[in-house]
């Protein structure tokens, strides 16, 4: 992986290259294995560049940067390869430079991967582009100044303009990620999908790539004439798998309860890898994905293990400091361009790789919900699967601007031949893919670089030759599994099954669903927004203290404070709130520069927010109930100034925490007494073994029930361990 930025003299606001290099080193979000600085010039031009490269599963740092006297330079980021028959051939920077050896040259059609490329030619012209879906993003100056980078803040640093762009910010609060090419910075734009950026003596040009993935002017629907394209896609996908695994030894493969990972498993089985596979699933014990994954492994006689996903096995309730520090670190690492819900945070530089089922969502429909009659409304389209301003925070003018951006995209797609049913899938491909998954790639690829067989160009082309209904029925998933590993067709999925519209051969298998009382299937630590009233109080104080943010031109500040007091956040609300927090962090300059792989990252100071009063808590311990292995505590707790919060409580002995419980049980008897909606009861247990250890031989021990992450106490009670 290699961060890079190229700029021509005159674009850097008069600052010399030496001064810029020091600033760029600080803006890079990684601790690189190798830094390469270079320049090239002619009588009328001079380019400068810097590349921050790390060792990957595929490349040494040196292999990702090429320069030669009189021949220019080339930097690659990601993974680039081409098909040689059925064998994948890796391309390094020198090989890519040789293919882009003259103005106007592009990579051959058999080149694949996930990558960003920049090539400086001997005549001073420059070309830059990324993979067709745009998963590895490129950025350029909004005014056409000769700057290109694969991290937006590097371009903003060269341009000496880090002012936020309200047009990009408001999307984070509306849906949790950006739409279109606006970035977090007003001076920087993202290169659109399937576009080529060129700089020559006459200035900047952005051209469309030839032979686009999405062609809507062809006959639609799967038929036997498309079998060769399907076979080509399967061959490309299996070549990608071979590229991403070692020559021998075990192969770790993720398996979930969904269809994407099952298609990848089918491809691996058909490629003869069965005896090398070691399946694993991320999730808490008993999560439907874990249950389904273990069942598939058992049916095939393959080993299976459970891994903790990001954040889900951590404490479900976070302290305010941990919450804000984590969000602020992600804001900085992600260039403030994606919401905080998915906890996209990198900690280490590593050369791991992973065969991923990502991109499979492009092969199927954005949503399985039926479309309304008539022309599709922009907001209704987004809401088929995702939030759109779920808390009603957008000012009318900002909402209208967002709807207008969506409407323009939709009308352009209709003009290209899109049906109404295509529009949600095109929205996903053209926006969520580069701007959400691309943001994940920009961080997590430095730890574990994914290989994505379902992103095979032939499969993507085939997906958009299907009808919208065929994608909704997940026809491609069915066809690939049927051809490669039909034994997998009848294994249960999590939350879903095969669509009966596939025909009588499609088995209906009851899906695996969450057990009663299971944790949320989507999200965990994020619900600290509901259970730690201190987080709400701190955020409300920060909003109240800074009324001059440009963000408030789009977001109703008073409505936001009201929601923090009175609205209990659900899944979509949380996505919106954590998107909004990223935008606030940017404007307030609160991003924590936690560099991926840097030894000093633990020493980065915590976020300093506006002062706030600790939330006032009332409540009562109604009773203590002893059982053979645990002692239970029950009662109610309520923060009157933050009635939507369902406060977390902590049981402590001599200051040591023995357990945390959330006052979220339904207690209708509390409502007549003014205790909110009554959903403020608590009941949690402490293992007797923990109480015995805490008692240190005493016959009884005093347990203090206190606010989690707060001062004071709710009750004290003596219990026998």
Locations of regions flagged by a protein language model:
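Short catalytic/ligand-binding loop motif for oxyanion handling, primarily in non-cytosolic enzymes
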Residues: 126-129, 135-139, 157, 313-316, ...
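Generic recognition of stable, solvent-exposed alpha-helical segments in well-folded globular domains
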Residues: 192, 228, 232, 236, ...
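ATP-dependent adenylate-handling ligase core
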Residues: 285-344, 358-388, 465-468
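Active-site cores of enzymes that catalyze phosphoryl transfer or operate on phosphate-rich substrates
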Residues: 197, 256, 375-405
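Adenosyl-5′-phosphate
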Residues: 9-11, 18, 35-44, 188, ...
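Conserved adenosine/adenylate-binding substructure
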Residues: 112-117, 247-250, 316-368, 403-450
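Basic, ligand-binding patches in group-transfer machinery
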Residues: 600-721
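Cysteine-centered catalytic environments shared across enzyme families
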Residues: 1-254, 259-308
């Amino acid at each position: 992986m290699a961060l890079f930025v190229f700029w021509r003299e005159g674009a850097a606001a008069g600052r010399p290259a030496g001064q810029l290099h020091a600033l760029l080193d600080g803006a890079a979000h990684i601790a690189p294995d190798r830094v390469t600085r270079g320049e090239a010039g002619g009588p009328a031009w001079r380019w400068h560049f810097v590349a921050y490269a790390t060792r990957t599963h595929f490349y040494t740092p040196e292999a990702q940067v090429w320069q030669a006297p009189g021949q220019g330079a080339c930097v690659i980021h990601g993974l680039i390869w081409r098909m040689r028959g059925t064998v994948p051939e890796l391309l390094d920077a020198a090989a890519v430079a040789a293919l882009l050896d003259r103005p106007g040259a592009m990579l051959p059609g058999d080149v694949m991967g996930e990558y960003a490329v920049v090539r400086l030619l001997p005549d001073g012209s420059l070309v830059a582009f990324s993979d067709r879906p745009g998963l590895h993003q490129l950025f350029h100056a909004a005014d056409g100044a000769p700057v290109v980078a694969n991290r937006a803040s590097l371009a903003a640093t060269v341009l000496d303009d880090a002012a936020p762009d309200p047009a990009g910010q408001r999307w984070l609060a509306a849906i949790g990620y950006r739409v279109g090419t606006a970035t977090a910075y007003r001076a920087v734009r993202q290169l659109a999908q399937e576009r080529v950026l060129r700089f020559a003596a006459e200035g900047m040009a952005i051209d469309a790539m030839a032979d686009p993935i999405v062609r809507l002017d062809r006959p639609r629907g799967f038929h036997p004439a498309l079998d060769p394209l399907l076979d080509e896609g399967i061959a490309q996908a299996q070549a990608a798998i071979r590229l991403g695994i070692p020559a021998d030894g075990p192969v770790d493969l993720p398996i979930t309860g969904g269809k994407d990972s099952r298609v990848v498993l089918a491809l691996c089985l058909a490629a003869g890898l069965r005896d090398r596979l070691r399946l694993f699933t991320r999730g808490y014990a008993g999560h439907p994905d874990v249950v389904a994954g273990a069942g598939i492994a058992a049916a095939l006689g393959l080993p299976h293990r459970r891994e903790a996903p990001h954040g889900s096995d951590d404490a479900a309730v976070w302290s305010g400091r941990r919450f804000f520090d984590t969000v602020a670190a992600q804001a900085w690492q992600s260039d403030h361009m994606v919401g905080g819900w998915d906890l996209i945070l990198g900690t280490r530089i590593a050369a791991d790789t992973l065969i991923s089922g990502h991109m499979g969502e492009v092969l199927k429909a954005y949503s399985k919900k039926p479309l309304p009659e008539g022309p599709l409304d922009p907001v209704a389209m987004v809401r088929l699967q995702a939030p759109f301003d779920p808390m009603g925070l957008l000012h009318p003018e900002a909402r209208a601007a967002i709807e207008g951006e969506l409407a323009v995209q939709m009308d352009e797609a209709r003009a290209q031949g899109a049906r109404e049913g295509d529009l949600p899938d095109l929205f996903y491909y053209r926006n969520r893919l580069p701007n959400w998954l691309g943001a994940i790639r920009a961080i997590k690829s430095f730890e574990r670089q994914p290989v994505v067989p379902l992103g095979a160009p032939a499969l993507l082309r085939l997906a958009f030759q299907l009808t919208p209904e065929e994608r909704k029925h997940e026809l491609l998933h069915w066809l690939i599994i049927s051809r490669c590993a039909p034994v997998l067709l009848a294994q249960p999925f999590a939350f879903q099954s095969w669509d009966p519209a596939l025909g009588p051969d499609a088995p209906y298998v009851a899906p695996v669903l969450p057990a009663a009382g299971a944790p949320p299937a989507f999200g965990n630590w994020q619900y600290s927004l509901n259970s730690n009233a201190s987080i709400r109080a701190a955020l409300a104080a920060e909003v109240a203290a800074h009324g001059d943010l440009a963000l408030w031109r789009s977001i109703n500040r008073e409505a936001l404070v009201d929601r923090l007091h009175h609205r209990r956040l659900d899944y979509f609300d949380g996505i919106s709130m954590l998107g909004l927090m990223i935008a606030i962090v940017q404007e307030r300059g609160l991003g924590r520069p936690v560099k991926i792989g840097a030894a000093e990252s633990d020493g980065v100071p915590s976020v300093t927010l506006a002062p706030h009063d600790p939330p006032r808590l009332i409540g009562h311990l109604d009773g203590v109930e002893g059982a053979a292995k645990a002692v239970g505590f029950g009662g109610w707790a309520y923060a009157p100034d933050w009635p939507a919060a369902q406060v977390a409580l902590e049981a402590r002995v001599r200051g040591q925490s023995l357990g945390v419980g959330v006052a979220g049980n339904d207690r209708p008897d509390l409502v007549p007494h003014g205790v909110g909606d009554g959903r403020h009861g608590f009941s949690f247990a402490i293992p007797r073994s923990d109480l015995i250890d805490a008692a240190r031989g005493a016959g009884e021990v005093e347990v203090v029930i206190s606010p989690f992450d707060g001062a004071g106490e709710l009750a004290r009670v003596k219990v026998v361990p």
